[in-house]
Amino acid sequence: MTSVDTPTPHGGTPAPAPATANGRKLLRIEARNAQTPIERKPKWIRTRATMGPEYSELKGLVKREGLHTVCEEAGCPNIFECWEDREATFLIGGEQCTRRCDFCQIDTGKPAALDRDEPRRVAESVQAMGLRYSTITGVARDDLEDGGAWLYAETVRAIKRLNPATGVELLIPDFNADPDQLAEVFSARPEVLAHNLETVPRIFKRIRPAFRYERSLSVLTAAREAGLVTKSNLILGMGETPEEVTEAMRDLHEAGCDILTITQYLRPSPRHHPVDRWVKPEEFVEHSRVAEEIGFAGVMAGPLVRSSYRAGRLYAQAMAHHGREIPPAMAHLAEEGTASQEASAVLARFGS
């Protein structure tokens, strides 16, 4: 195995307000954000890359076959650990989102036409990579009559047809809580249905203006009522207080959320929301303790945890929590693996 330290980029100097990737003029909020320099990151925002044999094999295969994963294209710091365990994430629906969130690096604009062949290609990529667990996420497609519900559902169905032993987690937008669109998505029966709340009520409208706090909770409730394992994520460091985080966790649990991930906000560019503060590892440990006390079936919290991090393990924990058996073909997901970005592990490496 080869190990190297991979620090995330440091900032600290003002940058000129850039145009967006698709050339559109900056929004007023983006221009205001850009007046704040990119923040210097603390010592614990660092990951240790361990390039084991599974990772090296996948890396070579992805390059040879021209496959595309969010893991590589977004430069995720957890790629070494996830790929070593044969887990990966794919983005569907194109490169343009019809909504804008102030933390998200995906550009807002008019999306390309629906690519109805995309589910097949994603399923074949999952097969080629020999994945044990796959996460599918995507952009909001309010331009489509069904909001993209068919695309999300068909991608799950295509993966399952070609890869019956691979777990599938589906991270969805809210589809405006439309019952028919949600029913289409739920009918594909992913192992986990995720919808990320991301932040607390007080700052929700500012951070996610096209979403609604209560509507997001209702999506999770509907998924739980459909018999699915549910999951959500909270991003810290955007202006919330610890007390508000606890209340949001309670709201999520009451809405029927089984699995919770909690992470630190990392600013993608100067035009995105400035980092309000760097949440220390010990605070993540405390949030994790409170979440478990509230009753979540699976919790993963840490500065560099992402919503798809160790997703297979969290699914297995949720199934065990509810006394449900994991399908025999997916029994491998219950095996213990590393979780180097979990808060207690980060605290052990870097201290407070």
UniProtKB/Swiss-Prot annotation:
Keywords: 4Fe-4S, Cytoplasm, Iron, Iron-sulfur, Metal-binding, S-adenosyl-L-methionine, Transferase. Pfam families: LIAS_N, Radical_SAM. InterPro entries: Aldolase_TIM (IPR013785), Elp3/MiaA/NifB-like_rSAM (IPR006638), LIAS_N (IPR031691), Lipoyl_synth (IPR003698), rSAM (IPR007197). Residues 83-297 form the Radical SAM core domain. Its cofactor is [4Fe-4S] cluster. Pathway: Protein modification; protein lipoylation via endogenous pathway; protein N(6)-(lipoyl)lysine from octanoyl-[acyl-carrier-protein]: step 2/2. Gene3D superfamilies: Aldolase class I. Its EC number is 2.8.1.8. It catalyses: [[Fe-S] cluster scaffold protein carrying a second [4Fe-4S](2+) cluster] + N(6)-octanoyl-L-lysyl-[protein] + 2 oxidized [2Fe-2S]-[ferredoxin] + 2 S-adenosyl-L-methionine + 4 H(+) = [[Fe-S] cluster scaffold protein] + N(6)-[(R)-dihydrolipoyl]-L-lysyl-[protein] + 4 Fe(3+) + 2 hydrogen sulfide + 2 5'-deoxyadenosine + 2 L-methionine + 2 reduced [2Fe-2S]-[ferredoxin]. [4Fe-4S] cluster 2 binds at residues 97, 101, 104. GO terms for cellular component: cytoplasm. [4Fe-4S] cluster 1 binds at residues 71, 76, 82, 308. NCBIfam families: lipA, PRK05481.1, PRK12928.1. This is Lipoyl synthase. The lineage of its organism: Bacteria, Bacillati, Actinomycetota, Actinomycetes, Mycobacteriales.
